[in-house]
């Protein structure tokens, strides 16, 4: 788990507003978008893609421990250089995730910030994606995996 704090550490906020990334800030699912892009680039085999689909179903139906499922879902990155994953995350962010940000989500963020809230992304998405979303939407902090 990674926590990134803004530089605005000395300002007292009245409350904290948490936002999930997938299907809350965006109309996309970051893991699905990453898996699709990784498959197209040859970073994810047919077998691993099929396994990810099965794990996704198990996750949604709560057929297995949620944390174990999440760990299994991201196991495909093992052995891939971190730079390659970061580049893939940046590509997916720019081409899929950021363009799918809900306009209402932007309004909600602005509303909370106007009311002196600390705005935080709380997500199981990759750190690179959460960080880029926070920077582009003027979000104060992230808590992500």
Regions found by a protein language model. Give the residues of each.
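A metal-dependent, Asp-based hydrolase signature
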Residues: 28-31, 43-111
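Active-site neighborhood of HAD-like aspartate-dependent phosphohydrolases
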Residues: 2-61
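A short, structure-level motif marking secondary-structure boundaries and short turns
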Residues: 19-20, 92-94, 114-116
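Residue-level signature of catalytic and energy-coupling elements of molecular machines
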Residues: 23, 85, 123
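A generic secondary-structure micro-motif detector
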Residues: 24, 98, 119-120
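Substrate-recognition element of Asp-dependent hydrolases with the DxDx(T/V) motif
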Residues: 108-137, 141-145
């Amino acid at each position: 788990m990674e926590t990134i704090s803004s530089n605005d550490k000395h300002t007292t906020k009245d409350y904290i507003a948490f936002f999930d990334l997938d299907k809350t800030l965006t109309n996309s699912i970051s893991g699905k978008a990453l898996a699709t892009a990784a498959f197209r680039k040859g970073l994810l085999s047919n077998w691993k893609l099929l396994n990810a689909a099965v794990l996704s179903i198990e996750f949604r139906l709560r057929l297995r421990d949620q944390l174990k499922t999440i760990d299994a879902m991201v196991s495909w990155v093992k052995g891939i250089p971190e730079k390659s994953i970061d580049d893939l995350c940046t590509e997916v962010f720019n081409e899929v995730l950021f363009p799918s940000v809900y306009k209402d989500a932007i309004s909600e963020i602005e509303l909370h910030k106007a009311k002196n809230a600390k705005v935080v992304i709380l997500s199981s998405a990759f750190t690179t994606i959460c960080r880029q979303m926070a920077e582009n939407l003027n979000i104060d902090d992230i808590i992500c995996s």
